């Protein structure tokens, strides 16, 4: 705790450095951060489904498992209410994500995660790059605050 206080600015600098790298990667993939927020909200809804339980912590299988976990989905109005983004804008962002094979809309107009084809390969690559960046962030912070004992 004292070590974190002594390195407070360093820790925040490393965190923001990671956050900017993470968001810039996704912004390049999905055009803007509002689209990313809409997509990540649908992903969070799927991963926080009470029926979604992971027995084996495996990054490669996680993305496939989370896609089949949400049998209901979210509607555009709910996404708008949660994010504060106007509904017409949410609808435009959803159309972009559906057209680019990130999301799926069912006959009840509910949106769920469904990453397919080339988009799946690109998002898996982004996920891997972001995990490396997260690991680097954790390594730098833990190394700086001397959490890991070298003895």
Question: Which residue stretches match the model-derived regions?
Answer:
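N-terminal leader segment of winged-helix/HTH proteins
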Residues: 1-37
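Long, amphipathic alpha-helical coupling/dimerization segments that relay conformational signals between
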Residues: 14-15, 20-22, 94, 100, ...
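Short helix->loop/beta-hairpin flanking segments within DNA-binding domains
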Residues: 37-72
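A short alpha-helical element within helix-turn-helix/winged-helix DNA-binding domains
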Residues: 66, 71-81, 97
């Amino acid at each position: 705790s004292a070590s974190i206080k002594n390195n407070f600015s360093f820790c925040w600098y490393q965190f923001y450095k990671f956050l900017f790298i993470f968001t810039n990667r996704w912004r390049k993939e999905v055009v803007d951060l509002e689209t990313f927020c809409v997509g990540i909200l649908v992903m969070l809804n799927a991963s926080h489904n009470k029926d979604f339980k992971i027995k084996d912590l495996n990054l490669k299988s996680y993305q496939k498992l989370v896609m089949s976990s949400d049998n209901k989905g979210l509607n555009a109005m709910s996404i708008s209410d949660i994010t504060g983004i106007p509904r017409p804008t949410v609808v435009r962002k959803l159309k972009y994500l559906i057209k680019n094979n990130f999301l799926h809309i069912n006959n009840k107009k509910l949106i769920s995660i469904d990453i397919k084809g080339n988009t799946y390969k690109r998002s898996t690559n982004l996920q891997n790059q972001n995990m490396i960046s997260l690991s680097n962030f954790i390594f730098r912070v833990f190394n700086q605050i001397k959490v890991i004992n070298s003895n």
